[in-house]
């Protein structure tokens, strides 16, 4: 018998990287599966890296219907009263540690591309927008070199208002809720906290909470830097080719607009 050792070569290691944050009651592996069609359309242009949230939770109902055997399930934020209370500074530290861990793990695999974007679904999209806002505030107060990140854009799939505060020491005049609070109820704006880093928002027109997604788009993101994709779907990641193509096109446009390498 002839034995051969076939080494699989990862041809995305040099590509610019997009950090991906799953929804609440899900996990990194599930979100990667949900994004498979988007990855397929962009795999020669970006490397997608999927982070795992720090806190355990029950599965979100839509997740349970398809991925019930894919646990354990995790969350970034509290959305139920029975989720254990936590100090804001401890929640922020746990979230940041998760993100830095997955970055280090990807570096260890040999990846070298710049971290150019954030992509999130549902609670993960709220987190992405909040991370971008923290970066924006830090860049304004400390300068770009001391912001801790340099993401050029965000892709927010079914992300709902409001943003949450991820650096209370800098958000002294902010009306944002802190990261330890339950923030899924309708936010009563308008908000003085406006994200100007470019974003594309993806809204399913049959999503029961699309009004909250519109609120994030309209009240928390600057008109000159936001884009919108609407598709005929509910609370999930688009999978049909034409729907995914619209999202992929806007990601390419954002990358070009922001000079992402």
UniProtKB/Swiss-Prot annotation:
GO terms for biological process: secondary metabolite biosynthetic process. Disulfide bonds: none annotated. Pathway: Mycotoxin biosynthesis. It is an enzyme of class 3 (hydrolase). Its EC number is 3.1.2.-. Induction: Expression is stimulated under green light conditions. Gene3D superfamilies: alpha/beta hydrolase. The active site is at residues 122, 207, 235. Changing residue 122 to A: Impairs the catalytic activity. Disruption phenotype: Leads to a significant reduction (over 95%), but not abolition, of citrinin biosynthesis. Belongs to the LovG family. Non-reducing polyketide synthase; part of the gene cluster that mediates the biosynthesis of the mycotoxin citrinin, a hepato-nephrotoxic compound to humans due to inhibition of respiration complex III. The pathway begins with the synthesis of a keto-aldehyde intermediate by the citrinin PKS (pksCT also named citS) from successive condensations of 4 malonyl-CoA units, presumably with a simple acetyl-CoA starter unit. Release of the keto-aldehyde intermediate is consistent with the presence of the C-terminal reductive release domain. This is Esterase citA. It comes from Monascus ruber.
């Amino acid at each position: 018998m002839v034995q051969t050792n076939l080494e699989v070569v990862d041809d995305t290691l040099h590509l610019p990287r997009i950090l991906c944050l799953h929804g609440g009651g899900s996990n990194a592996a599930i979100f990667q599966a949900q994004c498979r069609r988007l990855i397929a359309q962009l795999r020669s242009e970006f490397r997608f890296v999927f982070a795992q949230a720090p806190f355990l939770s029950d599965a979100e109902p839509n997740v349970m219907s398809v991925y019930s055997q894919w646990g354990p399930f995790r969350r970034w934020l509290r959305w139920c009263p029975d989720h254990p209370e936590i100090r804001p500074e401890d929640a922020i530290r746990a979230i940041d540690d998760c993100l830095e861990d997955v970055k280090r793990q990807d570096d260890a695999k040999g990846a070298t591309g710049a971290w150019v974007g954030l992509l999130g679904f549902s609670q993960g999209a709220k987190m992405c927008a909040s991370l971008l806002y923290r970066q924006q505030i830090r860049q304004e107060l400390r300068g770009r070199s001391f912001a801790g990140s340099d993401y050029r854009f965000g892709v927010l799939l079914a992300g709902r208002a409001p943003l949450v505060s991820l650096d209370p020491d800098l958000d002294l005049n902010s009306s944002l809720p802190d990261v330890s609070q339950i923030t899924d109820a309708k936010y009563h704006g308008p908000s003085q906290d406006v994200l100007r880093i470019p974003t594309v928002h993806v809204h399913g027109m049959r999503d029961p909470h699309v009004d909250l997604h519109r609120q994030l788009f309209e009240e928390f993101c600057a008109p000159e830097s936001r884009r919108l994709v609407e598709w005929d779907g509910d609370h999930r990641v688009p999978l049909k080719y034409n729907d995914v193509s619209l999202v992929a096109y806007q990601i390419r446009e954002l990358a070009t607009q922001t000079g992402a390498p």
